[in-house]
Amino acid sequence: MDLSMLRAKLHRLRVTEADLYYEGSITIDEELLDAAGLLPYEKVQVVNVNNGSRLETYTIPGEAGERTVCLNGPAARLAAPGDEVIVIAYAELTPSEAREHHPRVVHVDENNDVTKTRTLDVAKETDENLAPDGMEDVLIAEGPQS
């Protein structure tokens, strides 16, 4: 059985444009794609922090250095310029591959300039967050608890 694992994430990009009449996708500055290890035309999930919408599309490289983040086609209805979005790519991995996997997370500022890049260690996180009583598959989530 394969697991769907986080592969790369661009965290809190600021939408700069929305083009309803383009045929579809999300245009992202190619330097940002490179920073996260995302490829042109790779399938991604886009989560809008401002309104909670989620969509799947694919990436199109934008002009390097322009810091463009543009939702195209019908996706343009789900975000407006100024909205913050999280762009996520996943990989299908076997459990043994997943334990050796190192997802990349890129943080940006309000101008879509990279402020921090992290490479996560799945094996370390799994070992440190195992639930008691041998429940290896139950991880404790970080962040505020309700």
Swiss-Prot record:
Which cofactors, by name?
A: pyruvate
Q: What is its EC number?
A: 4.1.1.11
Reactions catalysed, semicolon-separated, are:
L-aspartate + H(+) = beta-alanine + CO2
Report the active site residues.
S25, Y58
Taken from the UniProt entry, a GO cellular component term is: cytosol
Look up keyword Cytoplasm and say if it applies.
Answer: yes
Name by which UniProt lists this protein: Aspartate 1-decarboxylase
